[in-house]
Amino acid sequence: AVLLIEVEGIADAVDADSELVKAACEASGASEIRVATSSEEREKLWEGRKAAIGAIGAAYPAFYLLDGVVPRTKLPQVMEDVLAVASSYGFKCANMFHAGDGNLHPTLMFDPQNQGVLDRVLECAGEIMRICVGIRVCGSVVVR
């Protein structure tokens, strides 16, 4: 897993916030921490984030990308729920998200040669989106 964190503001505040972020990452068991010290390094880190969907596509040419929004405080629980739902359907699921605004992109990877897989993908995607919008028991989400 990769966590890309960007800190913005005036120089003194950015330095202080960066130290807080670094300490939180270390306390959470981060195996590696990289800090961009130039705009070139920053762009290189962002290139990795932007290339994520291409990497998924190279490994799994058939995937279904969703776009949901949840309160930031709910992201850990939603991530667990999304992975549990994907697993219950037998799908691998990658997750990319903008944690700062609660926007997440669960990506279901599947083999299109499997009989009925597209129906299962859409059913699974519907369950995931119901998690994201808080529909637990009733209601409907149209997934196309």
PLM segments and residue spans:
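Noncatalytic alpha-helical scaffold of FAD-dependent oxidoreductases
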Residues: 1-144
